[in-house]
A protein has these predicted regions:
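N-terminal small/glycine-rich loop or linker at the start of catalytic domains
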Residues: 6-28, 61-62, 66-67, 88-98
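Catalytic cores of alpha/beta
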Residues: 30-42, 156-167, 202, 208, ...
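Histidine/lysine/aspartate-rich catalytic loop segments that bind and position anionic ligands
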Residues: 146-182
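Short beta-strand/loop segments at the ligand-binding rim of alpha/beta enzyme cores
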Residues: 14-20, 90-100, 141-151, 199-211
Length: 255
């Protein structure tokens, strides 16, 4: 069993939803990022999703986009992110990199797979790599024990879900809304259908993201559709930008 799947299964065995916070590398500052990473790791994050800043983040909402802009302006690079992660070899939480293909191509796909593995990365989410174009990169990552995480949404049909299921490991990222990331007051009713269809198509645990900001949103989801993990980013980034700690934010999700 892949480590990302194991972390979520372990949380389920403890009777809880796995927590996957998202933070942009280098945000709100280099030191602030290091502190947030350590706080999330020591306060119960099962997996930490780390955003690779990019100048044209098509799947990201305004909060994540602004965090990326500020990180890029501060000189954050993919090489620097991997070096930073190598400096934290004792993280309890698993780590997943979320980014776009262009920086990875510039880095070199083979070098990226090698160096990401050396940095302890367990998974990658790359929204602009469709299934049909993912085989080579998926194979390079898999050789290093890194899962390429699939994203599914309300417009992903059953045939495509099954095609993803045939090659995927780790977990499935279920997108709660059409469009970009960001805080929403409520989840659309269509997400229940997406979760149920994904549950039927995949043997892997489901992580729900895009728009989550309150544990009450999860509690409102019927048991038969409830995800195994929650991904939250924009609300955490706002919390950090206000000078508050990642630890205090995570405690809100553990209550």
């Amino acid at each position: 069993m892949h480590i990302l799947e194991q972390r979520i299964r372990n949380a389920h065995a403890e009777g809880r939803t796995a927590l996957i916070p998202f933070i942009t590398a280098g945000f709100p500052s280099s030191e602030g990022f290091r502190t947030a990473l350590a706080d999330l790791d020591s306060h119960g994050a099962d997996t930490i999703e780390i955003g690779i800043p990019f100048s044209d983040p098509v799947a990201d909402g305004p909060v994540v986009e602004e965090a990326s802009r500020r990180a890029l302006a501060a000189g954050v690079t993919l090489d620097g992110i991997l070096k930073e992660l190598r400096a934290h070899p004792c993280l309890r939480a698993a780590t997943v990199l979320m980014g776009y293909l262009n920086p990875i191509l510039q880095y070199g796909t083979e070098a990226f797979a090698r160096d990401a593995a050396a940095a302890g990365v367990s998974g990658c989410i790359i929204p602009d790599v469709p299934l049909e174009e993912s085989a080579e990169l998926r194979a390079l990552l898999k050789e290093r024990g890194i899962a390429l995480i699939p994203l599914v949404a309300q417009n992903t049909d059953e045939a495509r879900m099954r095609a993803y299921a045939a090659v995927s490991e780790g977990f499935v990222y279920v997108v709660s809304v059409m469009g970009t990331t960001g805080v929403r007051n409520s989840l659309p009713p269509q997400v229940l259908d997406t979760l149920r269809r994904a549950r039927a198509a995949f043997p892997l645990p489901l992580a729900l993201g895009f728009g989550l900001h309150d544990p009450a949103q999860l509690a409102a989801i019927p048991e038969d559709a409830r995800p195994d993990a929650a991904v939250f980013g924009s609300s955490l980034l706002r919390h950090l930008d206000e000078g508050k700690s990642a630890a205090s934010f995570l405690e809100l999700w553990k209550k």
